Amino acid sequence: MSTYLLIDTSTSRTSVAIVGDGKTLFASHHDGALSHGEALPELVAQGLKLESRIDQVIVGMGPGPFTGLRAGISFAQSFALGRGISWQGVCSLDAIASQISKSDFIVAVDARRKEVFYARYTDGSRIGEPKVCQPSQLAVFDIPIYGEVSNQYPDPTAFIAIAESGAIYSQPIYVRRPDAYPAPIGVKFRPMNQLDLVPIFSIERSAYGKEAWTMAQLKEESAGKDRM
């Protein structure tokens, strides 16, 4: 049987598992919405110490915030390419739904910007594609809601069964457009410096209110390797 490297970075949690011959050989995670890029290689390295033979990679394709999602997908694709093996993508919400035994329910995860990504499941099957809305709008369904809000995250060990069912994705499930857009013609760029943090903080607060990063978070992010 094949040995799988399973990765998910669609939520604030970075999750990695290695499953071989139907047994979970490694499973670990790291919590932190801003640390996917740093945590993922470390978790994979830990897993490879226990099982270095990987036949296939399966990665959660979202929906999820753009930056974290891309960290996992890019890593999975690069790892597979480097080893000359195949990779597949699955819906991360399906891996939360696999943990729920109810017959009719919603799975919702934080989409930031005061929104959630969600999907409805009936008798174990997802109804349509994932969507995005404000949390208060989910009340109209009048059915149980599970997911990140109740401390439930995608279980990567469920990815194998999901992929085998044929519910695979070759492109990220963004649901909404990324926050980044092509630059207007004629705009010039320069490296960011510490003096820019004050106006950046002001813009962040104006745009996102209570959801905005704190000055401490901005300083920590800007001080990271290759940030400026």
For the regions a protein language model found, what residue spans apply to each?
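Oxyanion-binding and handling regions
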Residues: 1-26, 31-39, 88-186
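Phosphate/pyrophosphate-binding loops at sites that engage ATP/ADP/AMP, CoA/4′-phosphopantetheine
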Residues: 44-56, 140-142
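A short, aromatic/hydrophobic, helix- or strand-capping loop or linear motif
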Residues: 40, 211-220
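N-terminal first-folded block
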Residues: 206-210
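Hydrophobic alpha-helical core bundles mediating ligand binding, dimerization, or RNAP-core interactions
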Residues: 201-205, 218
